[in-house]
Amino acid sequence: TAATQAKGAETDGLAKLARIEMKVDTSYLSAEERQVVNLLNQAALLMSEIYKRQATPDYDRLRAEVAAKNDPKLLEKYDAFYGPWDPIEDNKPFFGNQPKPPGAGFYPADLTKDELDKYIAAHPDQKGALTSPYTVVQRQGDRLVAVPYSQAYKQWLEPAAKLLEQAAGITTNPSLKKFLTLRAKALRTDDYFESELAWMDLKDTPIEVAIGPYEVYTDNLYGRKTAFEAFVTLRDPKESQALDVYKSHLREMEANLPVEEKYKNFKRGFESPISVADQVHGGGDNVPGVQTIAFNLPNDE
């Protein structure tokens, strides 16, 4: 029947995803490192709670509507994709018929790029705040206002910051302690630069963690707003060492890129760490839909 076909269309996207158990060898971790990883896993879950609201306006209301349908497969798909749109099918809605707003949950659903451009032109003093990678744009009457992430998502960021501080208090690795301490501060202040530098300096620890607002792909309105995510990984020293041969040729690779000379950047740092790692836990932007197998962070912003 037509109803049966419609129901099947709502859930068949799950068939394209294979559920695979990823087994990571954690036997070599010390008791201290194990404690730190467990705390980071908890913080990663909070990044997911934030990203659900960034990806889907009215996330909680829509999920309640899906749950009321008493269709386990439909609810499973909603939870798998953090909303009613299928990213594998170019964000085609599988619940309801509303297209995904270009600005996702970063802007009012009815806000257009043209309206935002005109508003910024009329209020140039607000441009920095409205286009910041770390603010949510909301309507207040006829005005557009920028709400810092640290305020908009405080109910998740504050406990996440406390978890990072707790982990920092446990680890005896100086570089990891510094990064986690600074990252906790950044979650409360929206100033991530110092903690990004500390992240680049992580050393002498198997724990590689990236946590915070990074990529802007979810913002299809302005391409500015960063999405929260987390990668809790354990470095594979043997496979990472195998990449050292490529690190020694980074300058040559830059010189041989098939682009005009003006696009080649020889002022960049060529000592950037490159690692192979096993992911223990993901959070936020890297969880729904197709999984990330590599990342290049931090971004210049």
Regions found by a protein language model. Give the residues of each.
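Accessible peptide chain termini
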Residues: 1-2, 301
